[in-house]
């Protein structure tokens, strides 16, 4: 599946209006989760998200305790905020190359968004990640999403269509870093100089940690 020319835990409600119309004058920030309170807020968001997925019969990781991962001060986690409210959390890392990908990349691990949010949140993360990768001289962003069934089956097919509309390429499926079957995603890095008017990156140039298999 290829993307047209120019969210991640699993299902999101489709966006019905444009960014500008839905969030006029909104100020977003991506920053490292540095305090115990921020890390606990991220863990609670993950728990809410996993509960939301479970109630809808959608997959959650079978092996890893993801909330505990976000509570761990040794995890280099980040959050997307709007006026101080945490909208999403993730674990970005510099990766020398996943088993299914060639070459270095920015790996977006453990992406979780607030339940019942529009696709705009995933789109913000997509824009931010592609710009961050470019600023770190990395050619690609890679991510994985759980996919227990064929990629052509719903609801994963609808999610992948929305992600390809945002610029992601689907690179097939296979075992993920924790052994679950996943869909493999790639995004081309792209400098976006005007993005700072929408998203402030308050991460001190985001000195990405090297890949650590314990924090997938």
Q: What is the role of each PLM region?
A:
Residues 1-35, 82-85, 135, 142-216:
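Terminal substrate-recognition subdomain of acyl/acetyltransferases
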Residues 95-97, 116, 148-150:
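Short coil/turn motifs at secondary-structure junctions
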Residues 42-50:
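Hydrophobic alpha-helical core bundles mediating ligand binding, dimerization, or RNAP-core interactions
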Residues 79, 85-96, 107:
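Conserved beta-strand in the GNAT
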Residues 50-82:
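Active-site rim helix/loop that mediates acceptor-substrate recognition in acyltransferases
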Residues 75, 135-138:
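Short, high-confidence coil segments that cap the C-terminus of an alpha-helix
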Residues 100-115, 144:
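Conserved acetyl-CoA binding element of GNAT-fold acetyltransferases
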Residues 117-134:
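Conserved acetyl-CoA-binding loop-helix of GNAT-fold acetyltransferases
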């Amino acid at each position: 599946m290829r993307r047209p020319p120019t969210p991640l835990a699993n299902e999101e409600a489709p966006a019905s209006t444009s960014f500008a119309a839905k969030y006029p004058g909104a100020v977003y920030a991506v920053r490292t989760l540095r305090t115990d309170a921020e890390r606990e807020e991220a863990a609670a968001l993950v728990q809410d998200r996993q509960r939301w997925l479970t109630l809808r019969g959608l997959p959650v990781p079978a092996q890893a305790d993801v909330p505990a991962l976000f509570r761990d001060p040794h995890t280099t986690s980040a959050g997307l905020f709007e006026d101080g409210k945490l909208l999403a959390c993730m674990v970005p890392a510099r990766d020398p190359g996943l088993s299914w990908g060639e070459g270095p990349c920015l790996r977006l691990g453990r992406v979780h968004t607030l339940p019942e949010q529009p696709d705009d949140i995933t789109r913000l993360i997509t824009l931010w990640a592609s710009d961050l990768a470019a600023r770190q001289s990395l050619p690609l962003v890679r991510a994985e999403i759980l996919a227990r069934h064929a990629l052509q089956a719903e609801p994963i097919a609808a999610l992948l269509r929305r992600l390809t509309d945002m610029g992601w390429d689907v690179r097939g499926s296979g075992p993920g870093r924790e052994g679950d079957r996943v869909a493999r995603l790639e995004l081309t890095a792209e400098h976006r100089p005007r993005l700072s008017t929408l998203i402030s990156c308050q991460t001190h140039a985001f000195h990405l940690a090297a890949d650590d298999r314990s924090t997938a």
